[in-house]
Amino acid sequence: MAKHVVFDEESRRALERGVNSLADAVRITLGPKGRNVVLEKKFGAPQIINDGVTIAKEVELEDPLENAGAQLMREVASKTNDVAGDGTTTATVLAQALIREGLKNVAAGANPVALRKGIDKTIDALVKEIEAKSKPVAGDAIAQVATISAGNDTEVGQMIAQAMDKVGKDGVITVEESKSLATEMEIVEGMQIDRGYISPYFVTDAERMVAEIENARLLIVNKKISSLQDLVGILEQVARAGQPLLIIAEDLEGEALATLVVNKLRGVLNVVAIKAPGFGERRQAMLQDIAVLTGGQVISEDVGLTLDKVDLEMLGTARKVTISKDNTTIVSEAANAGDVGKRVEQLRRQLDETDSEYDKEKLQERIAKLAGGVAVIKVGAATETELKDRKLRIEDALNATKAAVAEGIVPGGGTTLIHLTKTIESVKAQLKDEEKVGADLVGIALEAPLTQIADNAGKEGAVVVEKVRDADFSYGYNAMTDTYEDMIAAGVVDPAKVVRSGLQNAGSIAGMVLTTEALVVDKPEPAGAAAPDMGGMGGMGGMGGMGGMGGMGGMGMM
């Protein structure tokens, strides 16, 4: 395909137009009084949204040169979302301001490479300042962070704070769509496995169709069990001990399953069997997790253990096990806490070493199941449009809360960025010549988020910025109540990680745009060029005479 190549000022201006098209659509959502954006969908009702990254992903421009600029801005929002889970609109506003001011200087003859160096060095210094000013998050601050990110929804803020308190910082909190109108939370204590009973004959509560056993023994086997002979020895020992038994195996079939079911129905043995979770190497690892949690051993031929050699000491113990058709929840004894802690540390090290997003997600899940538990927030709303918007807000709030726990909090509402402008002068003292102009660009860009928040609230942004700049570090403008106050005391806080990653990603993309000298894009195809003229095909109408082919029936030579 032919390419369109543009150079110098023309390439940078095309990028800027694309940047502005996307950023102008995103920035109107910033702050507590930000507006909504309606996204047209090819199928179904339009989506009303207030989430920066979702809007950014929908913008596709007709002009390929401008679209390249829009794609770069989309990268700012996506990268910030990946790292911090929130703050995408702030990052977009910062990047737009840096690019706008930077291109003015490049057009006036400034050296783009020196500008980029100045921007990078200044942002590095500001990141250190953010780290120094951040405060650890505790108590009510968790609910405050979640409330701000959920668009000042106090109910959601309290719910997320409660979930974090229940499952701990290693726990997993998931967001699902509810079947009702209310938004509610469900806490699953213990380890939950996505496997249910092998046979419905194992249930102990026929009304709820679940099997519940207490003070149970666990036989954890990394193989398929089909022969009853393999199980006889251990079943006799468990029966003598008078305890219920949960068997976790690759599969259970044939006479082994039939005998267990018969013994269960006759009341000889209280037993339930489930299939092992996961596949391949991950199955082996998850069985080991269960063994550590319950203080048992995995019976595997890989380590020289076979079923005929198993005794009670090798079985795990659980305070309570609940098995439904699809899930099993194991609540372990507190005595195994030391071993569980060591296993969690081992998994954390694996988490730090892996690059795969999928592996990271699975490891995080395993850590949560071992260390804390799982909380599920079920989002309800009157219409599907409201449900989607609410779900996105809750996901943002959840991500912001995790970011706050990771790196602490700073004053919110654009306040921290304004007060960081005071450190620009000390940074400039260490820079050379035109690099200082890069530092000034960052100083101007830092004002953009608060200006936009004030504009969206119907105030004069420039006036608000000057008022906040002259005050203490935690003093800022609360757009929700239209007052100037101590933002941390008022509960208007941002996770330091969100502010940091937004600033870094904005600086990165701005530096790339400023140092662009050429732009290469696909040439749009002329309208109608792809479809050749089919008019000449009209003569095919004469094919009607083929009806005479019926005479071919005489070919029956066989």
UniProtKB/Swiss-Prot annotation:
Pfam family, one: Cpn60_TCP1
EC numbers, comma separated: 5.6.1.7
A GO term for molecular function: unfolded protein binding
Entries under SUPFAM superfamilies matching the protein: GroEL apical domain-like, GroEL equatorial domain-like
Entry keyword annotation includes Ribosomal protein: no
Coiled coil: none
GO cellular component terms attached to this protein's record: cytoplasm
InterPro entries linked: Cpn60/GroEL (IPR001844), Cpn60/GroEL/TCP-1 (IPR002423), GroEL-like_apical_dom_sf (IPR027409), GROEL-like_equatorial_sf (IPR027413), TCP-1-like_intermed_sf (IPR027410)
This protein's UniProt keywords: ATP-binding, Chaperone, Cytoplasm, Isomerase, Nucleotide-binding
Compartment list: Cytoplasm
Catalytic function, reaction form: ATP + H2O + a folded polypeptide = ADP + phosphate + an unfolded polypeptide
Binding locations of ATP: T29, L30, G31, P32, D86, G87, T88, T89, T90, G413, D494
PANTHER family assigned to the protein according to its UniProt record, in alphabetical order: 60 KDA HEAT SHOCK PROTEIN, MITOCHONDRIAL
Family of this protein: Belongs to the chaperonin (HSP60) family.
Protein name: Chaperonin GroEL 1
Species of provenance: Acaryochloris marina (strain MBIC 11017)
Gene coding for it: groEL1
